[in-house]
Structure formats: structure tokens, C-alpha cells
Amino acid sequence: MMKRDKKEEIAQQIAEKFQKSQGFYFTEFQGLDVQKMGQLRLEFRKAGIEYKVVKNTLIKKALRDAAGADKLAEGLKNTTAVAFSYDDPIAPAKIIKKFSKDNEALKFKMASVDGTVFGADALPQLSEMLSKTDNIARTAGLINNMIASVPMVMNAVMRDLVSVIDQVGKLEK
């Protein structure tokens, strides 16, 4: 059994992870064998996501000062592992959805993404969202297209103006 001061220390470390992360996801893994759990951890590690098995009581202590703590605490039943994402808050949703298709033992409980709490039914929507990198790339592409189209529009205006002047000149003759 863990001593109280050790539990407080672990709860403090978990609280720091919650604060640093842009998104965190609670999963249930009961029934997932060691090999599958290793594969899941590897997938998370490749994406720069930290995946930890944590006791529910320690998670509750770590969340006591967090926004939405009551709502998050409701989902803490059975075994819980937490995926902490520090860069891309949507990446864990994509991994969880993909991995749980072949491994029904992995269940999504809930998540907090940029301070918004999502329930167990939100995984499909979360996994379909674009990452920040994708959004930035899409926005940059739109801006680039707008910049590229400005000279074409200006040329069209000038061409039309020349055409109108030419037509007026022909009418006066």
C-alpha cells in the first residue's frame, strides 16, 4: 500500500501533466493483454503522447482545482489510463479510435481538449477534427490562393477597362 505523502506527490505530478497538456483522454483498458497494451503505448509514443495508468483516486486529487473536475470525475470508474497530449490535442482521439476498432477492450471514457470536456460519445467527432498543424496548413493555403488571385483580378479589371475604352473609341469613329 502506498504511503500518503507518496500519493500526494504522484497526484501533484499528475496535476502538472493535466496543466501542461493541451488535451487529455481517459480510457478503460480492462481486458487488454500486455502485448496489445504495449502496441497502444508504442502508437502513443510515436505521436509524442504520454500514456499512463493511474488510480482513479489519484486522478481525482490531481483534478481537484481543474475546470470541469466534477464532470471529469464522473467518468472515473473501473481501470483508467490517461493519454496526455502536449502538442496536438486531437492526436489521441485518432489513435484511440483506430486502435479500439481492432481491440474492443480499449474503451474511450472522456476527454478534455483545450479546457472543454467531452463525454464518451464524442470520440467520433474528436477523431474527425483537424489538428492544429492541418488547420494552419489549410489557412496558409487559402491565404496563398487569395494572394495569387489578386494579380489575376487586377489584370482582368485592366483588360476590361482597355476593352471598354476600345469599344468607346470604335463608337466615336
UniProtKB/Swiss-Prot annotation:
GO terms for biological process: translation. The keyword Metal-binding does not apply. Keywords: Ribonucleoprotein, Ribosomal protein, RNA-binding, rRNA-binding. The keyword rRNA-binding applies. Disulfide bonds: none annotated. Pfam families: Ribosomal_L10. SUPFAM superfamilies: Ribosomal protein L10-like. One of its GO terms (molecular function) is large ribosomal subunit rRNA binding. Gene3D superfamilies: 3.30.70.1730. One of its GO terms (cellular component) is large ribosomal subunit. Forms part of the ribosomal stalk, playing a central role in the interaction of the ribosome with GTP-bound translation factors. Part of the ribosomal stalk of the 50S ribosomal subunit. The N-terminus interacts with L11 and the large rRNA to form the base of the stalk. The C-terminus forms an elongated spine to which L12 dimers bind in a sequential fashion forming a multimeric L10(L12)X complex. Belongs to the universal ribosomal protein uL10 family. This is Large ribosomal subunit protein uL10. It comes from Chlorobaculum parvum (strain DSM 263 / NCIMB 8327) (Chlorobium vibrioforme subsp. thiosulfatophilum).
